[in-house]
Amino acid sequence: SCVYPCVILTYHNNSRNFWQRFVQHAILKRYLKKPFRQIHVYSNMFCSDKEYASLFGELFKPTKELLNLIDYHLAQLGGAGNYVSATFRFRQLLGDFKEGGETLREDERMPYIEKCINAILKLHEQIPEKKILVTADSHTFLDTLKERSLHYVYVMPGKVVHIGFTQNASKKIYMKSFLDMYMLSYASTVFLVRDNIMYHSGFPYRASLLNGARYDEIEL
């Protein structure tokens, strides 16, 4: 065969860890030396970060529908670079989905949600002049956050699903993931909020590369 497809995934994906980057680069280099005309790699490893934005731009172009959504939400947030973002990746912690990882008991969920909301309150104290775009994979968390009616918090509408566990959904639902990525990319700083039981998602980091946003992590 002229084509070699491979999937290389890792749960160790800390952008600040030099040795993780070094080992990932060595593994990918070994695969890319295989004697095939085309090598198709699906991976969440760190690679070609400097070229990521330009390569992404070559492969993907937003449709008019997506561009209209981006323009609308940018206007609500004051324009590109005039807001920050905070991303939470709960998986099934709050009982929204069946995806893997632990699930908190019902009596543990609200205190945990409060802990996460407090991280947003503290972030606002540090940068009171900026709105905060909040994205998450839990409608329970987002609904609770919206009930607070915090004037500086912006949550985009749309059904929250886990793409890898969702089949035959509407176009609108799949569009939400693309919209989230582009909206994160236009923030001045992209924050991933995490602790030792949340999933250490690479999604916000990759989004930050698209338009040169600063990336940082907030530990609960």
Residues of each region from the PLM?
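Secretory-pathway glycan-assembly enzymes, especially type II membrane glycosyltransferases
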Residues: 1-110, 114-117
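N-terminal cationic-hydrophobic initiation segments that often serve targeting/anchoring roles
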Residues: 78, 121-125, 146, 184, ...
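Structural motif
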Residues: 83-84, 131, 189
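Catalytic donor nucleotide-activated moiety binding site of glycosyltransferases and closely related
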Residues: 87-95, 118-170
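Short amphipathic alpha-helical segments
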Residues: 99, 145-147, 204-205
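Donor nucleotide-activated moiety binding/catalytic core segment of transferases
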Residues: 110, 155-193
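Marks the mature luminal ectodomains of secretory-pathway proteins
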Residues: 115-116, 130, 155-156, 202, ...
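A donor-sugar binding/catalytic signature common to diverse glycosyltransferases
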Residues: 175-220
